[in-house]
């Protein structure tokens, strides 16, 4: 009888836990995805803060030339970064227990791999948690779909690109200047500026910013005034009110006359879908571009594509970009190799004929 009571009590505790996890009445929804999201993001955040402050230099290129990234080793907020895991480790799974000592783990950049893998798992669970909460509330799933764009972008630079290049040392450093360095080296090695998917991503991000500013300014300019001239127009809105807060007909008429009639939306739902879809699709394409360039399917190469009647090259902007790429490639990892990879790959002529 005692055993039966204990089993019922344990089932009751489990049931209460399940109800609490999935309850939409909590101040912050947890959900089953949140059970995994919370510890992974806490781990990634904690290790990032500690490593950014105090991690020792990391042998990123695997040539016994450590690079300092933490504040206590001479960096500031701008120059500081979590240095990627050493090229000597490559793509190996490198937890603390795989190293001979903590010092070795730190020297080989173990914190980077720990942070990145926990972070990617955490943000993927955050996306799942968005879907889960939408499902519980009877909402459509588009919030999670929109969030999939930055998740895909992060996965591309932190996981797919290192896999394609063969080492976590090629991943994006976790810092401001490290991000810029990653971008410059990426351009040098893959000519990303000439890749159509990157162009679509630029159109998505800048276009999304433009459309957001246009929409916000149109709405703000066509508010239905509920207050006097001496009060803020914002005071005329009450949370949950059924009435429209702005005159979409006026906004539609203004924009239609400013550009042309069919440039303006007359359906609020299709308008907001467009505002969400434009940047999301653009960032999806950017992530896809990074993922293809990870395996060296690079941007277009129009070098020396224009010649005169004598066969002399007429330089185009593509040739200027190529010259800049060579300069950037020469300068990065300058002690790891003597020549840019594309120059070193040229077949050497035979001396003996």
UniProtKB/Swiss-Prot annotation:
Q: How does it sit in the membrane?
A: Multi-pass membrane protein
According to the UniProt record, list the residues that bear N-acetylthreonine. Answer: 2
Annotated positions binding chlorophyll a PD1: 198
Stretches that traverse the bilayer: 29-46, 118-133, 142-156, 197-218, 274-288
Q: Does the keyword Transport apply?
A: yes
Q: Which residues form the signal peptide?
A: none
Spell out the PROSITE patterns in the cross-references. REACTION_CENTER
CDD domains found in the cross-reference section: Photosystem-II_D1
Could you give one GO CC term from the UniProt record? photosystem II
Binding of chlorophyll a ChlzD1: at which residues?
118
Q: What are its E.C. numbers?
A: 1.10.3.9
Sequence positions that bind a quinone:
215, 264-265
Q: Which keywords describe this protein according to UniProt?
A: Acetylation, Calcium, Chlorophyll, Chloroplast, Chromophore, Electron transport, Herbicide resistance, Iron, Magnesium, Manganese, Membrane, Metal-binding, Oxidoreductase, Phosphoprotein, Photosynthesis, Photosystem II, Plastid, Thylakoid, Transmembrane, Transmembrane helix, Transport
Q: Which residues bind pheophytin a?
A: 126
Which modifications occur after translation, per UniProt?
Tyr-161 forms a radical intermediate that is referred to as redox-active TyrZ, YZ or Y-Z.
Swiss-Prot/TrEMBL catalytic activity? 2 a plastoquinone + 4 hnu + 2 H2O = 2 a plastoquinol + O2
Principal location class: plastid
Localization in the cell: Plastid, Chloroplast thylakoid membrane
The miscellaneous remark of the record is: 2 of the reaction center chlorophylls (ChlD1 and ChlD2) are entirely coordinated by water.
**What family does the database annotate?**
Belongs to the reaction center PufL/M/PsbA/D family.
Q: Which PANTHER family match?
A: PHOTOSYSTEM II D2 PROTEIN, PHOTOSYSTEM II PROTEIN D1
Per the entry, what this protein does is: Photosystem II (PSII) is a light-driven water:plastoquinone oxidoreductase that uses light energy to abstract electrons from H(2)O, generating O(2) and a proton gradient subsequently used for ATP formation. It consists of a core antenna complex that captures photons, and an electron transfer chain that converts photonic excitation into a charge separation. The D1/D2 (PsbA/PsbD) reaction center heterodimer binds P680, the primary electron donor of PSII as well as several subsequent electron acceptors.
**UniProt-recorded name of the protein:** Photosystem II protein D1
Q: Which organism is it from?
A: Cucumis sativus (Cucumber)
């Amino acid at each position: 009888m005692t055993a039966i009571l204990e089993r019922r009590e344990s089932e009751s505790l489990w049931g209460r836990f399940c109800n609490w996890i999935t309850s939409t009445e909590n101040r912050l929804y947890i959900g089953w995805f949140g059970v995994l999201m919370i510890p992974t993001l806490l781990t990634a955040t904690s290790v990032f803060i500690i490593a950014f402050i105090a991690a020792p230099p990391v042998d990123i290129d695997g040539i016994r030339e450590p690079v300092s990234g933490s504040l206590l080793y001479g960096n500031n907020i701008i120059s500081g970064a979590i240095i990627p895991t050493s090229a000597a480790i490559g793509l190996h799974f490198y937890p603390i227990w795989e190293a001979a000592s903590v010092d070795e783990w730190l020297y080989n950049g173990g914190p980077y791999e720990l942070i990145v893998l926990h972070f990617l798992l955490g943000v993927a669970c955050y996306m799942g948690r968005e879907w889960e909460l939408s499902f519980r509330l009877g909402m459509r799933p588009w919030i999670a779909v929109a969030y999939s764009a930055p998740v895909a972008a992060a996965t591309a630079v932190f996981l797919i690109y290192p896999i394609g290049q063969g080492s976590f040392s090629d991943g994006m450093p976790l810092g401001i200047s490290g991000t810029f360095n990653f971008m410059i080296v990426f351009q040098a090695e893959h000519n990303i500026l000439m890749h159509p998917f990157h162009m679509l991503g630029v159109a998505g991000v800048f276009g999304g910013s433009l459309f957001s500013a246009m929409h916000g300014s149109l709405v703000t300019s066509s508010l239905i005034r509920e207050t006097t001239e001496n009060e803020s127009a914002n005071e005329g809105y009450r949370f949950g009110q059924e009435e429209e807060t702005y005159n979409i007909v006026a906004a539609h008429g203004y924009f239609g006359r400013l550009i042309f009639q069919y440039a303006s939306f007359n359906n609020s739902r299709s308008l907001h879908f467009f505002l969400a879809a434009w940047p999301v699709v653009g960032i999806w394409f950017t992530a896809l571009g990074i993922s293809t360039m990870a395996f060296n399917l690079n941007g277009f190469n129009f070098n020396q594509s224009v010649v005169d009647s004598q066969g002399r090259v007429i330089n185009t902007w593509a040739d200027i970009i190529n010259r800049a790429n060579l300069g950037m490639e020469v300068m990065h990892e300058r002690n790891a190799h003597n020549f840019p990879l594309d120059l070193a790959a040229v077949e050497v002529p035979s001396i003996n004929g």
